[in-house]
Amino acid sequence: MGCKRSVGWGVSAVHLATDPLPQTFLGYRRSHGRPGIRNHLIILPVVAGAHLVAQRIAARIPGAIAVPYLDDGVSGKEDEAMTDRVLIGAASAPNVAAVLLVNQANDGRDSHIAHEALLRTPGRPISTMSIEACGGSVKAIAQGTTLAGALADAIAKAEREEFPVSELIMAAECGGSDATSGMASNPVVGVCADILIDFGGTVCFSETTEMMGAEHILARRACNEEVARRIIEIVANVEKAANAVGATVAGGNPTPGNMAGGLSTIEEKSLGCILKGGTRPVQGVLDFAQPITGKGLWLMDTPGHDAVSVSAKAAGGSHLNIFTTGRGSPLGNAIQPVMKVCANAATVAKMSDNFDFSAAPIISGLATKEAMGQDLYRLMIAVCSGQLAAAEAIGHYEFAIHHIGILD
């Protein structure tokens, strides 16, 4: 709705702007909570069996986005609680203006998720339906299209207005890392993160497996002893969980792709990964998809799986994700823009359609991380104000949920 895609910004040339850094963005006011940077109507299935119906409904409503995810595979109460936490977070995310929840059975799970989402975001238009109650998939698609159409009408007149950047929550992610990630891409994102935090905003990064070997550095940046203890604890828990099944985190990290890109050990990879969080104190450690409510820099305890980790922070309430890659990744997200940053000139040339910003000038000595970090910050604010990220323009709307426990 009113979004435009800027082709090749930061990819074809070094910008290095000198104008003042923006301290406001254009977003959508919500009746409760933070403003959004998108005005999405999402069609959210609450179980895997409702995915197709959700997709067919979304296809009939211009601008609607279906949010299918990796199968529900719930294997116990703890796992079910985690899945519900992600779905509730998605339904109450700041970029979501309205929600249609689609259930398979008439068991009330959709109503439970709607109720919890409304506790977080009172006044949000949310409708629920079940395929069983409608009398089957064909009738459900017809009824869902009517419900979704009404929701689309309810949010159609929303207009952007100015807000301070202190309202923004930026997420950071890396995937398909190579040597250039730690040398340039992640440091540039770190500069951008520091700028936003200094303007009163919030930054969250995750992927606990990729803090291993660098957790002591993050712990030294903790705002207090309890936060430092939690940082050490979540990394130790990952290794303990791997050992319990006869594996080690280092056994799968770095990946073959990481090693082909010049990374030799998990410690080397982690030292580069944590740079995307900038240099400010760590305020706390959040559980998977836990709401991000504080200011400053936060860590979230997630696996290293890119789609899962991005979705967790989106469900936690982040507005957008800045994703660094050296080997290349097309990944997007259903409820937030995912901006791609790459410092590998060969990868940028090969996959230019998938990138928003090139940090390759740092590698070639044409720019500094500080100057490019400011440019990235400006681009981030443009995306927050409506410019489409590459993944959005292409239509990458991935979403995934982490599952725990043993399948029945």
Predicted segments with their positions:
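Metallocofactor- and cofactor-centric catalytic cores in central/energy metabolism, strongly enriched
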Residues: 2-320, 324, 329, 333-408
